[in-house]
């Protein structure tokens, strides 16, 4: 199994199995195929990256994904993270993912089609705005850092929902876990991370 070492990051067997089912090699540029299974982020063009496998696993773990979850992802990138999450929410769940770069959306859509995954919707748009027409969401995951948590994302999170988002600047970023309980927003700092900026 490719990602067995992720158990040392606290990633569960269920998530490791989902990650092993989605071939990361399909999601990286041809010139980086030899590095596809290394536990490092890789450039995918347009100033964007595919996250290191341990970060994908940890973020899925923090989200507590379950069958039937409706998930909003900000930053489709290569589509790898959405593909993994699509397995974790099952056929009754759905992944809505937003990407601002049309070329990345086209490439991600091709990969998703190739894999025969049919519970993902990829949309070109501004992540800060979320997707009001499909809200509310059980879970929201953000794969780019924000200087502040966008208010619209909190508004689109279901009561008792979970959001995982990197917050900070180009030098220091903290991965935060946000829980929404009625009018109350509970923030927890998880770990230091390094992501590309939300535009």
Swiss-Prot record:
Transmembrane parts of this sequence: none
Stated family: Belongs to the methyltransferase superfamily. L-isoaspartyl/D-aspartyl protein methyltransferase family.
Protein's recorded name: Protein-L-isoaspartate O-methyltransferase
Task of the protein: Catalyzes the methyl esterification of L-isoaspartyl residues in peptides and proteins that result from spontaneous decomposition of normal L-aspartyl and L-asparaginyl residues. It plays a role in the repair and/or degradation of damaged proteins.
Subcellular localization, as worded in the UniProt entry: Cytoplasm
Lineage of origin: Bacteria, Thermotogati, Thermotogota, Thermotogae, Thermotogales
Keyword Aminoacyl-tRNA synthetase: no
Keyword terms: Cytoplasm, Methyltransferase, S-adenosyl-L-methionine, Transferase
InterPro entries: PCMT (IPR000682), SAM-dependent_MTases_sf (IPR029063)
Reactions performed catalytically: [protein]-L-isoaspartate + S-adenosyl-L-methionine = [protein]-L-isoaspartate alpha-methyl ester + S-adenosyl-L-homocysteine
GO (cellular component) term, any one: cytoplasm
GO biological process, one term: methylation
GO molecular function, one term: protein-L-isoaspartate (D-aspartate) O-methyltransferase activity
Enzyme Commission designation: 2.1.1.77
Gene of this entry: pcm
Source species: Fervidobacterium nodosum (strain ATCC 35602 / DSM 5306 / Rt17-B1)
């Amino acid at each position: 199994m490719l990602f067995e070492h992720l158990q040392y990051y606290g990633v569960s067997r269920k998530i490791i199995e989902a990650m092993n089912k989605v071939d990361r090699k399909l999601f990286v540029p041809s010139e980086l195929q030899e590095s596809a299974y290394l536990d490092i982020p890789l450039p995918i063009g347009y100033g964007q990256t595919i996250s290191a496998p341990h970060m994908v696993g940890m973020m899925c773990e923090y989200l507590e994904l379950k069958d039937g979850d409706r998930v909003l992802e900000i930053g489709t990138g290569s589509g790898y993270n959405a593909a993994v999450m699509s397995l974790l929410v099952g056929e009754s769940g759905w992944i809505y993912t937003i990407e601002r770069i049309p070329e990345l959306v086209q490439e991600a859509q091709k990969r998703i089609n190739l894999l025969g995954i049919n519970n993902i919707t990829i949309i070109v748009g501004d992540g800060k705005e979320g997707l009001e027409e499909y809200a509310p969401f059980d879970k929201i995951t953000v794969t780019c850092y924000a200087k502040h948590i966008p208010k619209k994302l909190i508004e689109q999170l279901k009561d008792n929902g979970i959001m995982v988002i990197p917050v900070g600047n180009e030098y220091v970023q903290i991965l935060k876990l946000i829980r929404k309980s009625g009018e109350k927003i509970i923030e927890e700092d998880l770990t230091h991370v390094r992501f590309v900026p939300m535009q």
